[in-house]
């Protein structure tokens, strides 16, 4: 963001940046200057031209300090919340961090012996406490995920060109050094052009293959490897040679170019050498991503459960390890004591649930104590649960089903307090919104995920209004705390079975074979459903209704719902 402001101040042409994105960045700058947290989920409703949630998330990734291609080590922005949080964590006695930061800390300690939670030379904290621990394996898995996109290469290419140009600036005034610098620039641009063309060819091939399969997400399996991968990897290896040449040039110019150096502003050959070294690491990481994502070198069907599920969504390839239990065991071993807490740590509070937990979380060695703490809530007095069995609510009924869900929302209006409706897909949610929007009473407001603001902003408005209607998908099934009458009716549109074509679900199911239903689908569904229903009762004084508009809950899955809910399930048409 600071670079864009700098370019604008210089009068540079920014026509390659979409006007809506510039408006978005301007709003971000105003938000942060006014005390904004810098966290994506806390984004307020943006003024100006609107963009859908996917486009806005892509804009955000270009300025996020958490992006894989961002290097914060030499950042001179003293007010950066990302850097400030890391500095505070390194000197604190108690560190409160999110799951991703705990996972990142472990990876850094394992790779380069560097901890985010301790100053150099000191041991990391002795005790690790993870709340909402049911979610931790996914966050941990993400630390070992890699991706391949045109944007990743474009960003790396620009950084390499900028760094080589800066090295050339130091060479001005010396004929020999300048000749070497110009030769280096020309050589790099040639390799970069080859990589650019071949990456475009890779993505054209992938999109063509995806269209053949008539799918919006291509799950890749052995045999789907890109046949011309070496045409990208070979010039990429030559780029490493260019970077080493640039480092040697920096070393040779040190005594001659010292007059141009300014350490405080980071304008020095020493700084450029460090920068070139880190860029070389990014080139190696891109090469590894090419192998895993397009070459399928670590696919789970080739090397087993620790291998990758790989997929292409039209914009990028992703490779993600399927099972990380062995790596989790290494994390637990790095702390003297580990405490995990969650209302849904075990899919079921019995032996099957405990066994699943041990296997999934990597507790295969050492002493472990597991238990279920009694709830402080009187669920039989505080919650009443219904399942709606009207024939129109069958999953195959499409728009008719959406109309019937809208009718249940309309009936809930006569009860005081807020209404939350949890969906398993954006499509069904948006169809129901079309039916419900014209009928919202004057004393209520309709808040829809992806249309009326970020998660934090929607929840704040929902709580403060006290009589609102909130429609949410995925992230609203958990991590939502709305005590009191602000939430008195919770409608669950459908039992949240994971989609079988989700990459990790497909991989886990394939590895589990005939036991997939019992060991994969049921535990994951149970935890999601229990999390969703848990949004209703947050204090000992809360009361309300749960309505599940999925007739399967009273049919073949009745036993399953009985295990998930803390109260009996009543039938209603």
Predicted regions and their residues:
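Signature of the SF2 helicase/ATPase Hel1-core->accessory helical subdomain module
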Residues: 67, 75-94, 98-250, 343-361
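A substrate-engagement module of RecA-like helicase motors
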Residues: 1-93, 100-103, 158, 165, ...
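Conserved interdomain hinge at the start of the Helicase C-terminal
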Residues: 388-424
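Conserved RecA-like ASCE P-loop NTPase motor core of nucleic-acid helicases/translocases
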Residues: 340-343, 417-429, 547-549
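Conserved helicase motor "Helicase C" RecA-like lobe of SF1/SF2 P-loop NTPases
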Residues: 424-450
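A contiguous, basic/glycine-rich beta-loop/short-helix subdomain that forms a polymer-engagement track
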Residues: 59-90, 95, 103-118, 246-383, ...
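Conserved RecA-like P-loop NTPase helicase motor core
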Residues: 388-399, 450-554
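N-terminal targeting/trafficking signals and adjacent low-complexity tails
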Residues: 547-573
